[in-house]
């Protein structure tokens, strides 16, 4: 399909006048039938890279996603725009699943979102063969790599897709992956001479800061105070931590609520919607929050505890400032976090998992303790060269370094 048609589809379905960097080239490669590897940081517009080609071509595109809530959000948005999309997952009752499968048999859909464990069932694979998919897109593709920060064993089975579906083009997408993880994704999925697209990890509007944690509540309130009425996310490492902090913030006059995987789905959804509508100023969350959250005006992200790895930290801070305006990313650092994280790592049964987790934590600690430009340390981790001498935004570039205890 010629580019002008893609542009009109971009406008009519998604409401955009122009592509973001790399999107058009990725879409052209997909429509040419190539395997494609996409590394695009959070907020760069990854989803469009498989959604638009799916709508531009005949037949069905399969989208593998590990996140049930995100599946529903994306399908709802596509359906609202008039795009024929559906999902199959464990939230559907038997009758609704049958209805959707019937629609797939009749060719009524162009996009099917499905979790990896459902996709790899033999019954699903037999149906897929009869639906003759034109492309398989694998979102969060870093989950296939044992060297990544979010390895999921069910993703490993996706390696069989190439054997089962032969020459069907595949697109692997991720927001964060080191060189080693990228190579592992290509190898595990058996991508054949893939077109590789790597967007820049540089977010010049984000002002990274690491400060010694002394009184977490007081320090969190100080950051919120600088952002009067503006939206922010505070990440905590435990579910209890999110609830305690949200309660303390409310006592101090801040509209805040918790978000974690232990809450029931309705309460989580309610808090998420309230945050997006600006009825809440602050969400106190575990890493369960944020995947696919489309809120461009988050002005600050605070990490009350040390994250387990730099990939996760980069992705979570990347939820700030998606509108391109400046935003603060503050990490409260205390050496006791390292001891605690190390204890969790040593409880893992698998020695390889322990070794990878130790290495990832070590790199996170290096970032926290570094006197170098924060942007440089982050970009270096993702093998991207930072050309500037000084980012003129992070604490290390703007002010002398305080020594940690």
Describe the residue ranges of each PLM region.
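Cys/His-rich short segments
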Residues: 360, 365, 369-405
């Amino acid at each position: 399909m010629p580019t002008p048609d893609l542009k009109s589809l971009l406008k009519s379905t998604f409401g955009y006048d122009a592509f973001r960097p790399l999107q058009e080239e990725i879409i052209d490669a997909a429509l040419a039938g190539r395997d494609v590897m996409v590394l695009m940081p959070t907020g760069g517009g990854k989803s469009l890279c498989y959604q638009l080609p799916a709508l531009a071509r005949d037949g069905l595109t399969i989208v593998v996603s590990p996140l049930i809530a995100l599946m529903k959000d994306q399908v709802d948005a596509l359906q609202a725009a008039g795009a024929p999309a559906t999902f199959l997952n464990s939230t559907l009752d038997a009758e609704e699943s049958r209805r959707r499968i019937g629609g797939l048999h009749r060719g009524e859909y162009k996009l099917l979102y499905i979790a990896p464990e459902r996709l790899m069932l033999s019954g699903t694979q037999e149906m897929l063969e009869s639906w003759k998919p034109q492309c398989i897109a694998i979102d969060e593709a870093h989950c296939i790599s044992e060297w990544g920060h979010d390895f999921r064993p069910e993703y490993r089975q996706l390696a069989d897709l190439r054997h089962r579906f032969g020459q069907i083009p595949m697109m692997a997408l991720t927001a964060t992956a080191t060189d080693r993880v990228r190579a592992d994704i290509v190898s595990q999925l058996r991508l054949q001479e893939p077109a590789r697209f790597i967007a820049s990890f540089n977010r010049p509007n984000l002002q990274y800061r690491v400060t010694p944690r002394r009184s977490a509540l007081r320090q969190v309130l100080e950051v919120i105070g600088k952002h009067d009425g503006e939206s922010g996310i505070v990440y905590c490492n435990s579910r209890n931590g999110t609830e305690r902090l949200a309660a303390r913030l409310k006592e101090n006059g801040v509209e805040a609520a918790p978000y974690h995987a232990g809450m029931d789905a309705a309460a989580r959804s309610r808090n998420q919607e309230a945050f997006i509508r600006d009825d809440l100023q602050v969400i106190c969350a575990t890493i369960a929050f944020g995947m696919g959250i489309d809120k461009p005006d988050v002005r600050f992200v605070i990490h009350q505890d040390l994250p387990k790895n730099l990939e996760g930290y980069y992705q979570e801070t990347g939820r700030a400032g998606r509108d391109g305006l400046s935003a603060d990313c503050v990490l409260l650092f205390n050496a006791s976090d390292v001891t605690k994280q190390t204890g969790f790592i040593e409880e893992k049964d698998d020695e390889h998992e322990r070794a990878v987790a130790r290495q990832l934590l070590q790199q996170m600690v290096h970032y926290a303790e570094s006197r170098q430009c924060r942007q440089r340390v982050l970009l270096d981790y993702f093998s991207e060269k930072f050309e500037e001498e000084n980012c003129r935004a992070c604490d290390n570039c703007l002010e002398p370094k305080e020594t940690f205890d």
